[in-house]
Amino acid sequence: MKILVTSALPYANGNIHLGHIAGAYLPADIYVRYQRLKNRDVIYICGTDEHGVPVTISAEQQNKTPKEIVDHYYGSIKNSFEDFGMTFDNFSRTTLPIHHHMAQDFFSKIYNKGYIYPKEIKQYYCPRCNRFLPDRYITGKCPRCGADGAKGDQCDSCSRWLEPFELVEPKCLICGEVPQKRRTKHWYFKLSAFADKLNEWIATKTNWKEHVLSFVKGWLREGLQDRPITRDMSWGVPVPLEQANGKVLYVWFDAPIGYISSTIEWAEKKGDPDLWKEYWFSKDTKMIHFIGKDNIVFHALIWPAMLMAYGDYVLPSDIPANQFLNLEGDKFSTSKNYAIWLPDYLRDFKADSLRYALTRNAPEARDTDFTWRDFQAWHNNELADNLGNFVNRSLTFIKKYYGSSVPTASTFAENDNRMLDILHKAPAGIGEKLEQFEFKNGLREIMKMTQEANRYFDHEEPWVTRKTNPLICERTMYVCMKIVTSLSVLLEPFLPFTAAKMKKMINFIPQQWDAIGAPDVAPIIGDTEILFQKIDDKVIDLQVSKLKKREISIEEFGKVVLKTGKILEAEIVEGSSNLIKCTVEIGDTQRQIVAGIGKEYKAQELIGKTVIVVENLKPAKVRGVLSNGMLLAADTKEGIVLLTTDKPVASGEIVR
């Protein structure tokens, strides 16, 4: 059997945060590391998703080219993953020629089979930006849950897949203009043709996670609709049809093909260009996609349908999608910069402390919450005081009283045999949890073992028996060394850096997962070190304060639409000496805006002034008067000063 493991391709428009890690990456790495210890044929494939609207939006907001954006974040993401201990066999990019060729081949094969067809449709068009708007360039309210900030393809609040025309109060994400509906042509994937096959296939997946099956069956019950797979953009994989000039493949069609192109790249690096076919075309391949729950519909319905349409390819064996990880009671939000970014974390803390916390609190079946206080408690109480304490007390005792030579024993008492029996059963018991993607429970079993080990050490009192009965002391320390040796392997999938330190300290004799129930113990230990230093309250206080006093991202700032305006009329609001009601021309429209500038300006002197307006501010009533926008001003010691332009500018121009 071959095992092909993938993690969802991260968008190369920003760094990775803890929510991403907990969802699609850490669980996969644990699983792959375990399979390697079982000496199984497994490869782990990933890469950055470098096409799509998130990239072009970031580029426009940062005044850069899409290539500049993806080049930067590919390196940043790859380095962060490596520092976190991720062990991809290949980490590719969807902008590589190998991927473009594969994606176009996929399109052409499915098109020639009749599963892709053209269709003239209406699409939103921004008259100010002078272009058709891809779905993520449109924002508005979700028609299902009412959340603001829903995109034209999906609502992040309720995970509902949306169509742009379903949005309530749609606007252009870049300029805030209300878009128009215009006709254009796109190519559609005939997803509806695979409804029966998908139903039959899903019916065989009784072992999948309950929430994954529930989500998929819900979509199937509602009926599958054909999906557009092209976009009016220049950034992406060009559609390989003459009549589709100027269009690219939709990222949801393009991205999963990246799993194949990344595997091809891996095979070429191995010097065997056809090796990838042994994984993708073999019925003996077990293909597992690790994703977050927001990607279920793409990986469990659309992607399998694409593979069915092409033919020959293996279908996913399992899709153990995780639920969401929240942060201090709120959702992670990249747009609001409410997140703990992996590069920032790794500057302050060790990777294994986070790997432990995210696995211990993994959102495997329900949403969970990450808090800095929990992180500190788990690190100090469970890693330092439990695991680290047992390893340290065992090794330092041997080093101090046996000159680093590990005692041996051939006969054991009842308590010794009890611990050895726990060791003997550990590989199979923990392995079963990992095979079923129950990583949290697998880690829990290991930590129970370390608790038992500490109790064993305390009960046997080697500091006493060293003097009263040296043979019992030697036996105790021999058992302790067997435990430490086993832990150095059992912990490797979860805490690889810690496991590596332990192996170095005990001069580890190489052995696989199945052998560590009765491990070989090295005769002499090496230099020892404390595995985990405790984290002080002040360090955690600083991290908590960073979330409260966070900087906003360029994406978040980009949501504020600033435009030039010209004040046409102005008058004092009745009953107020400070509020002035202004009629402001913004391009072809006029807005009523109330500003608290009456102490510095007389109403009449404002008429004709060019001002800077926040155009997309939610309307509000001020002293009972509707205000639809905001005038920007500087708050100086001498009073408020309205901001204007250095040179004459027409109203309605975008301010960057």
What feature does the model see in each segment?
Residues 1-201:
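N-terminal, positively charged nucleic-acid-binding surface of large information/translation enzymes
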Residues 366, 374-412, 422-524, 614:
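Helix-rich, typically C-terminal accessory recognition domains appended to large enzymatic cores
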Residues 317-321, 503-505, 581:
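Beta-strand segments within the central parallel beta-sheet cores of soluble alpha/beta enzyme folds
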Residues 1-46, 98-102, 168-400, 444-446:
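Structured secondary-structure scaffolds
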Residues 10-11, 148-150, 177, 234, ...:
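Short, glycine-/Ser/Thr-/acidic-enriched flexible segments
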